[in-house]
């Protein structure tokens, strides 16, 4: 009998304890669906838009920002892209005056905005080219800035550059030039007289490259100076009253790669 009574009392105590726990922990109603949806939307909107971020650091985006920051009325033409090292970003510094603009193009391992102060630090970005565009009072004045030469009429020792193109060599003061014409362009390679083969080799490489690539169409002429010693690569062409100059390019064939992107 005592065992039955004790079991009954233990069962009653368990029921009372369970009821007490239930009263102390009331059910918390679920949040309304609209509130949950609102919070999810807020969290989603706070995430960065990956597509916009990527678009802002593409070459097209960088070049658009370049043109926007120039704030010039000069009718200059910029390319859609430039040849840069894989895995790097294109950026630039800009400077504009009434009749002249200067753009220094850089490649960097990190994304740097146009005209970022960090571009003054050589270890943060590398100069790949400088573009200078200047407007003259007339097309005749602009044409005087182009060192155009018809090499077939200038004399010099004839040399075969391939692709049915003849070059003409001229030496003086320790320098050896190999020049030729392609359309409205006058192109010449420069080397030292103690390394004459290098000038012809570079000229042949340039001719072969231009077999499948087009330089900008000048109005009226253009000139290219390609240096074996990588110290004075210069490409200049006229577009009516405007004169485009590309320099600060170390490798001569890279200078041609930079120039062809201005073809349109």
Task: Locate each region found by the language model.
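N-terminal, intrinsically disordered, polar/charged segments of Gram-positive cell-envelope systems
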Residues: 3-12, 20-128, 136-149
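Short Gly/Thr-rich strand-loop-strand
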Residues: 143-172, 204-231
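Short, isolated positions in well-ordered beta-strands
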Residues: 165-167, 187, 244
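Short, surface-exposed beta-strand/loop micro-motifs that present aromatic residues
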Residues: 174-180, 232-238
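Internal helical hairpin/lid segments
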Residues: 178, 188-189
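Mixed-charge (acidic/basic) macromolecular-recognition segments
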Residues: 183-185, 193
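Surface-exposed amphipathic alpha-helical segments
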Residues: 194-220, 240-264
């Amino acid at each position: 009998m005592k065992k039955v009574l004790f079991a009954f009392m233990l069962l009653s105590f368990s029921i009372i304890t369970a009821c007490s726990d239930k009263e102390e922990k009331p059910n918390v109603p679920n949040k309304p669906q609209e509130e949950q949806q609102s919070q999810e939307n807020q969290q989603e909107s706070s995430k960065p838009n990956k597509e916009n971020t990527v678009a802002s650091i593409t070459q097209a985006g960088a070049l658009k920002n370049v043109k926007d920051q120039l704030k010039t009325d000069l009718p200059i033409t910029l390319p859609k892209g430039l040849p840069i090292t894989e895995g790097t970003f294109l950026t630039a510094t800009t400077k504009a005056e009434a009749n002249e603009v200067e753009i220094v193009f850089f490649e960097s391992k990190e994304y740097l905005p146009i005209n970022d102060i960090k571009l003054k630090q050589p270890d943060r970005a590398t100069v790949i080219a400088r573009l200078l565009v200047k407007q003259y009072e007339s097309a005749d004045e602009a044409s005087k800035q182009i060192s155009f030469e018809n090499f077939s009429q200038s004399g010099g020792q004839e040399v075969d550059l391939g692709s049915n193109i003849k070059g003409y060599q001229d030496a003086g003061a320790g320098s050896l030039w190999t020049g030729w014409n392609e359309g409205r362009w006058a192109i010449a390679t420069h080397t030292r007289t103690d390394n004459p083969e290098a000038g012809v080799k570079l000229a042949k490489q340039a001719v072969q490259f231009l077999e499948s690539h087009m330089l900008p169409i000048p109005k009226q002429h253009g000139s290219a100076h390609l240096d074996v010693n990588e110290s004075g690569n210069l490409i200049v062409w006229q577009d009516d009253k405007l004169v485009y100059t590309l320099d600060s390019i170390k490798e001569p064939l890279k200078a041609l790669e930079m120039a062809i992107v201005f073809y349109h």
